[in-house]
Amino acid sequence: MASNGTSVSPFRSQKNAAMAVNDTPANGHAEPSTITAASKTNTTKITSQNDPQSSFAVKVGLAQMLKGGVIMDVVNAEQARIAEEAGACAVMALERVPADIRKDGGVARMSDPQMIKDIMNAVTIPVMAKSRIGHFVECQILQAIGVDYIDESEVLTPADPVNHIDKSVYNVPFVCGCKNLGEALRRISEGAAMIRTKGEAGTGDVVEAVRHMQTVNAEIAKASSASDADLRMMARELQCDYNLLKQTAQLKRLPVVNFAAGGIATPADAALMMQMGCDGVFVGSGIFKSGDAAKRAKAIVQATTHYNDPKVLAEVSSGLGEAMVGINCDKLPETQKLATRGW
């Protein structure tokens, strides 16, 4: 149970110990075109210091520790404690949930570091924070204050219209969004240790997350049955690394964890994405924009754990109060769709 004082996070202690042994040099460049140990197990053997491949494997292993869990958006320490008590595996610290970012408009930037540190001090579970696409200085700041994961997020206003961040030069594991397999593999090639669907954050409409997961699954299935020549052609079409695509085809899944995000608002939504093959879920506006946040948070955690048990799903879906009103994605103008950001 977290207290009002500074909390000691067992996860953070373990992460810092692992990264201290396997420190990536400030100007080092990992080349994660082939991933081995971390795609098979939650623990990674560290083979040598300053080895980019080994460092990347450690980050992938840290991301795998969240598998099967729910990551919740929180805007203050009180919400973070509610999320932790509900069973969240991590929290995403940000000043405004995506629904408010949509409503308020303007430029959405990295959150105030002090607010993030307050949340880190309030809970013992991992804390994530968002940076703008391409804004490597925001990532330097987030790493400096000790966040556990960084989300290079399309929810914030992109800082670079062309380039994503070279994530390999940071010790902190990165999570990035995707709409399709090409985007996912490009982000992994840049050093992302965790992938999520983009969906349409802040809408409460799960349809885009479903679409993105279906697309990734279909493209992996196509790659898995392709000849070597066809696989090389597919890599060119997807604009991704051939070796990484080949590994994905052999695994019949992404070589890093793949969570669902964007529009998940109910326990049924969470179970739907898990049954489609996701490794866990992000829930943003769906919890703290609902009638009973604490009860809904617990219900979504239970639904994510027991996603194949309709009786449990029926039980945890009952009596939750009003869900967030939401926005129908079909009514969103293209200019308001966050998933189109990035490439």
From Swiss-Prot:
Positions annotated as active site in the UniProt record: K130 (schiff-base intermediate with d-ribose 5-phosphate)
Main EC class the enzyme belongs to: lyase
Gene ablation phenotype (knockout): Defects cause some indirect sensitivity to photosensitizers, due to the inability to synthesize pyridoxal 5'-phosphate. Indeed, pyridoxal 5'-phosphate quenches singlet oxygen at a rate comparable to that of vitamins C and E.
CDD domains to which the protein is assigned, alphabetical: pdxS
Keyword set includes Transmembrane: no
Pathway(s) the chain acts in: Cofactor biosynthesis; pyridoxal 5'-phosphate biosynthesis
Binding site for D-glyceraldehyde 3-phosphate: Q214
Chain residues that bind D-ribose 5-phosphate: D73, G202, G263, G284, S285
Statement: the UniProt record of this protein carries the keyword Lyase: yes
PROSITE patterns: PDXS_SNZ_1, PDXS_SNZ_2
This protein's UniProt keywords: Lyase, Pyridoxal phosphate, Schiff base
PANTHER family: PYRIDOXAL 5'-PHOSPHATE SYNTHASE SUBUNIT SNZ1-RELATED
Name of this chain's protein: Pyridoxal 5'-phosphate synthase subunit PDX1
